[in-house]
């Protein structure tokens, strides 16, 4: 089941939450900063943990579209979170094209596959690339819906996927996009 919800992803109850990270996992702003702050209290410490895990899991100091890094939830465990899955979406700067859609699909699918591999049943995503990366929210929501619904047809463990939107305005825009797509 794919559902769009209004709320704070750092307080959302899901087994995994996804961080919309930059490729160096520096968590300097937006939802990445909020997740790092909520997980550790000390953003620089969470950056250190993230970079250490990236070197262990990927073998280098950056991740590409579709790659993910998993870190412990630390303080987020109180919400039932078992994993934070970091992925990188495309930078749009207000421009959307097929290349950006493909990169976003890779980011979403990479996180979903990793969650399924980890045995996760519920996973919460922010609107990857729709914030400071400047991708149009409407296109991000459409891409999420298509990728998630296709993935759920063959998922072994993941059953519940949430797109968690912090602002009321973004939530209402997303609902309108989904309603239009249903017609």
UniProtKB/Swiss-Prot annotation:
Domain of life the protein comes from: Archaea
InterPro entries: Macro_dom, Macro_dom-like
Domain Macro as annotated: residue spans: 1-182
Pfam family, one: Macro
Protein name: Uncharacterized protein PYRAB06560
Upper classification of the organism: Archaea, Methanobacteriati, Methanobacteriota, Thermococci, Thermococcales
PROSITE patterns: MACRO
